[in-house]
Amino acid sequence: MELKVKNRQDLKARALLLGDRLDLKLFKIADCLATTPLTIQVDNGGGIAVLFRYGVAVFFGVPTLDEVRFVEMLRPLLTNPYVTPEIEELEIHSGKGGIGVQSGAVSLDDISLEKLQIIADALSKNLVLKLYEKKVAGEFDKIEPLAQDLATNGKVSAGSKKLLSKIGSMLLIEHRMVGRAEIGDKPETLWDNPNLEGLYASLEDEFELIERQSALDRKLGLISDTAQTLADVWDNKQLHKLEWYVIGLIVFEIFISLFELSGKFWK
């Protein structure tokens, strides 16, 4: 199948993060322009969509109505679809002297399927990072008062179940970034097209993918470590309570035994 949009001078890319996961197994290989990543023609004008299993669809040259129709078609294939998807747009201009990325626009010498796939990869990773940056910032806001409470009053107000839940949330974010989106990995398209390394590097710099992932990893580690520390403090507190309960029971047993012995003695 021919890539019709390659003849366009200007092209708009729109990336949408639609849900936690997108099931791609139902698409027929015969209907695809490419399978890694899955790329299909969406409308009669030749607009295409590049789909990623971690819930992102990237559209190139697709009219609004066709995009809406296609997104609706994808909804049954989504796990935990988002009510309001994350969106990123990028202008693509071809027929330029070279390849470059600046201020939300990509300049290309010509348009090819491989170049669009690389652009889609960078856009999709940018959206995943944007979503989890928001989630991690929210967790930071929630856990800071707990740490402040420990520093000020020497106690933990939240229970260990709640704290362990936060640790689980951080591990889940890390799993989705590394295991599904593979944020730190280069796109597979580069394996057969090493000449496009420069394009991907420019996009990586434009969206600061490496720096943002590194910052997010540090925040995830900090939140997880803080929650673990608070959970340990809580567990120790509960253990001390239990120890006092045991001591109390022992004292009570001794008191009962002495009472019974004293009764026998006075008889």
Predicted feature locations:
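Short Lys/Arg-enriched alpha/beta "domain-start" segment
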Residues: 1-109
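Short secondary-structure boundary segments
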Residues: 10-35, 113-134, 200-201, 252-255, ...
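Short, charged N-terminal helix-start/capping segments
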Residues: 56-59, 66, 92-102, 150-158, ...
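Short, intrinsically disordered, mixed-charge
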Residues: 72-79, 134-141, 182
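Short, flexible segments with low predicted structural confidence
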Residues: 103-104, 148-149, 194-195
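Membrane-proximal low-complexity regions enriched in glycine and acidic/polar residues
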Residues: 114-179
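Membrane-associated alpha-helical segments
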Residues: 154-265
